[in-house]
From Swiss-Prot:
The keyword Cell cycle applies. One of its GO terms (cellular component) is spindle pole. SMART domains: WD40. This is Nuclear distribution protein nudF-2. WD repeats lie at residues 112-153, 155-195, 199-239, 242-281, 286-345, 347-386, 391-449. Self-associates. Interacts with ro-11/nde1 and dynein. It is found in: Cytoplasm, Cytoskeleton; Cytoplasm, Cytoskeleton, Spindle pole.
Length: 453
């Protein structure tokens, strides 16, 4: 011990041991140790005992805390080393949007909501971002400047989802809520509420404009149904039944022919909405808990996903050949159009809340209640190549990628195309389509964060 501790340190340790044994009601053991160390009772009087009382416990807990900190730092170092090993040179990152990935710190942290943020959505043309919250409001931000533009009030309970889209030249904002309604807002008229769509019998958890349709909107609800609405009339034109529990999320394909939905019944379903009475085209079974989120892969990702599935030639017959789902079972699953799970991505330590495919087709991004944002490389069998460890200070509830700018898009938005949707059906977003390297996330920590190049 003399080789490790100085004489003074050894003496302090001995006294702390005696004080600990005395406090633990082990006087005989304390006396034996005192005798062995030649410490008389006069030397180790009550005042000395008081001084050293609790010292050993404090030292012990300090060691445990330090050990945990070291383990955390080693884990963080491993993540950073992995990111470094897989990093694209900075010069290439700036020039090649197809390879761009978000990195900390965020460009902006947007603060104004008073309760957890549930959803975000980018305007298809302008630098506007909408966020919805459990505080019953929608806030419109300028994501380039990081400034709040306005607060929209109208819902009487939590706002659960928002989306931009609508008829050509007349982009609308849709929102849905726990108050059972969907509301339409006109950005060109100071976000005036132009229509309210009642009809669901329980909370409306997701809403999306259907690309290519111009005036159709799909919603998902806790009443176990999906509904398709005509925004020009406000009428429900189709009701989709099939899920046995709460329908959590919905994602339309790029051409609007298919809709992917997720549910508390542990399944996801792909619907062909071109037929009069849509039924599930395929049911995706495999998750072991509630399926919270989903995304349909863009055609740019087909080659990478086909290789992962062991298919030599990427399919080109459908706009919904591959899909991703995220669940409370902490996993992400990749699926083909036949309902086969081609890969399970494991890495999150809590519920997976949001998914978005990189417009370039190489990556899938996810957010989770573990406070992280993860990037999965589809060219490396879905390997996690980047983790933003503290993307937020609490559960991360949503993620959206800014839509690619289409050169011939009208100034007010074009034909209800959703985030990242290319102009022509089936054509992938490319650098020529001006991929915008901008991502928004929202969290229970009341913050919206903008990650941008």
């Amino acid at each position: 011990m003399s080789q490790i501790l100085t004489s003074r340190q050894a003496d302090e340790l001995h006294r702390a041991l005696i004080a600990y044994l005395t406090a633990a009601n082990l006087p005989n053991t304390a006396a034996a140790l005192r005798e062995e160390l030649n410490l008389s009772e006069e030397v180790f009087d009550p005042a000395t005992a008081k001084k050293y009382e609790g010292l050993l416990e404090k030292k012990w807990t300090s060691v445990v805390r330090l050990q945990k900190k070291i383990m955390d730092l080693e884990s963080r170092n491993h993540i950073l080393q992995s990111e470094l090993d897989n990093a694209t040179p900075t010069s290439r990152q700036n020039k090649d949007p197809v390879a761009w990935l978000p990195r900390a710190p965020p460009r902006h942290t947007l603060q104004s909501h008073r309760d957890p943020i549930t959803c975000v959505a980018f305007h298809p043309v302008f630098s506007s971002l909408a966020s919805g919250s459990e505080d019953q409001t929608i806030k419109i931000w300028d994501w380039e400047l990081g400034e709040l533009e306005r607060t929209i009030k109208g819902h009487t309970k939590a706002v659960l989802d928002v989306d931009y889209g609508g008829p050509r030249g007349n982009t609308l904002l849709a929102s849905c809520s726990s108050d059972l309604t969907i509301k339409l807002w006109d950005p060109l008229d100071s976000y005036k509420n132009i229509r309210t769509l009642p009809g669901h019998d329980h909370s409306v958890s997701a809403v999306r404009f259907i690309p290519g349709s111009g005036n159709l909107l799909v919603s998902a609800s806790r009443d176990k149904t999906l509904r398709i609405w005509d925004v020009s009339t406000g009428y429900c034109v189709k009701t989709l039944r099939g899920h046995a529990e709460w329908v959590r999320d919905v994602c339309p394909s790029l051409d609007g022919k298919y809709i992917l939905s997720t549910s508390d019944d542990y399944t996801s379903r792909l619907w062909d909405v071109t037929i009069t009475n849509p039924e599930p085209k395929v049911t995706l079974i495999g998750h072991e808990h509630v399926v919270l989120c989903c995304a349909i892969a863009p055609p740019a990702a087909y080659q990478n996903l086909a290789a992962m599935a062991g298919i030599k030639k990427p399919p080109a017959t459908s706009s919904a050949e591959f899909m991703a789902t995220g669940s409370r079972d902490k996993s992400i699953r990749l699926w083909d159009a036949r309902g086969t799970c081609i890969k399970t991505l494991v890495g999150h330590d809590n519920w997976v809340r949001g998914l978005v495919f990189h417009p370039g087709g190489k990556y899938l991004l996810s957010v989770s209640d573990d406070k992280t944002l993860r990037c999965w490389d589809l060219t490396q069998e879905g390997k996690c190549v980047k983790t933003i460890g503290d993307a937020h200070g609490h559960f991360v509830q949503c993620i959206k990628w800014a839509p690619s700018v289409i050169k011939d898009a009208s100034v007010n938005g074009d034909n209800g195309e959703p985030n990242g949707t290319p102009k022509k059906g089936g054509a992938a977003a490319t650098p020529e389509a001006q991929i915008r390297c901008v991502i928004a996330t929202g969290s229970v920590d009341l913050n919206v964060r903008i990650f941008a190049n």
